[in-house]
Amino acid sequence: MSTLLLEAAPNTVLGNIIVVSGAFIILLVLLRLFAWNAITSVFASRAKKISDDIDAAEANNKQAADLVKQRQAELAGSKEEAANIIQVANDTASQNRAKVLATANEEATSLKKRAQEDIEQERKEALNTVKGDVADISVQIAEKLIGQSLDASAQQELIDSYLAKLGE
């Protein structure tokens, strides 16, 4: 009996291989008929999604690079604009400084001129006052020396001649 089992065993293994192979082929045919399109469509959709994601990432990278270039250009423009604003402010400050200095110089010149005019006026008034005082003193001295009073015209002639002598 045991020999019979041993002799039948090689046939069973061969039979098993044939049955399993047949089942596998049937399974492949069934998979091909019912599931192959679904499986390949899943793989195709996954491949398409990955491809779209890669394209989107590349587009985003390009957009980011463009945005960086734009921001750098704007920054350069802002720096240039700031430099222009500073230059304009410096120019305006220089012009204002020049105007203030010119105004101050004009005011100083005007004040100096007015002061000189005031000094000249005061000098003239002082001379007139001194002339009047000298005339009064001269008349008093002349009255005492002559012993008589002088009339207004004689007094004026005496003053003028005295002042003329002082002026020489």
Curated annotation (Swiss-Prot):
Keywords: ATP synthesis, Cell membrane, CF(0), Hydrogen ion transport, Ion transport, Membrane, Transmembrane, Transmembrane helix, Transport
Highest taxon above the source species: Bacteria
Keyword Transmembrane helix in annotation: yes
Membrane topology designation: Single-pass membrane protein
Segments traversing the membrane: 11-31
GO molecular function, one term: proton-transporting ATP synthase activity, rotational mechanism
GO cellular component assignments: plasma membrane; proton-transporting ATP synthase complex
Function: F(1)F(0) ATP synthase produces ATP from ADP in the presence of a proton or sodium gradient. F-type ATPases consist of two structural domains, F(1) containing the extramembraneous catalytic core and F(0) containing the membrane proton channel, linked together by a central stalk and a peripheral stalk. During catalysis, ATP synthesis in the catalytic domain of F(1) is coupled via a rotary mechanism of the central stalk subunits to proton translocation. Component of the F(0) channel, it forms part of the peripheral stalk, linking F(1) to F(0).
Listed NCBIfam families: ATP_synt_b
Membership in a protein family: Belongs to the ATPase B chain family.
Alphabetical list of HAMAP family matching this protein: ATP_synth_b_bprime
Subunit organization: F-type ATPases have 2 components, F(1) - the catalytic core - and F(0) - the membrane proton channel. F(1) has five subunits: alpha(3), beta(3), gamma(1), delta(1), epsilon(1). F(0) has three main subunits: a(1), b(2) and c(10-14). The alpha and beta chains form an alternating ring which encloses part of the gamma chain. F(1) is attached to F(0) by a central stalk formed by the gamma and epsilon chains, while a peripheral stalk is formed by the delta and b chains.
Name the record gives this protein: ATP synthase subunit b
UniProt source species: Lactococcus lactis subsp. lactis (strain IL1403)
Recorded name of the encoding gene: atpF
